[in-house]
């Protein structure tokens, strides 16, 4: 059997880079791309492909504030392990980034930011309500950041939305919290 690492593998990184190529092809004037970060495979692939085609595009990585492993690693200029906390974004709850992904991200990332669970819930609710799209919590962090920290007017920004692995009970809780937060549900 061949074991392929979920994020710290050059083939996985290259495959995920295709997303970046597609963005550049469809939106050649894109200014910023916001990418979820767990172990770093997705952002490493996208950043490699995009920066090769257009080094002026800003790549902003987004982590859960409960697991800021890549952010801490970049800030301290060494691979870091975080203890982590509870988060609904379990798909990116990675304690230590990959060695290969860390090196790529360290050299090319423009910025890494974090979001809280409440921001993620708001983004997921908005996606479901307005776009009828269900995205897992880990895949909604990029939009969560954009919604909370509005990009500069006139900028073309792309949030990467990915994954649909979500428990039905959690999905129900997110809808309930979203409706309650908007004053549209009595409890």
Positions of predicted regions on the chain:
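PLP-dependent amino-acid enzyme catalytic core
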Residues: 1-187
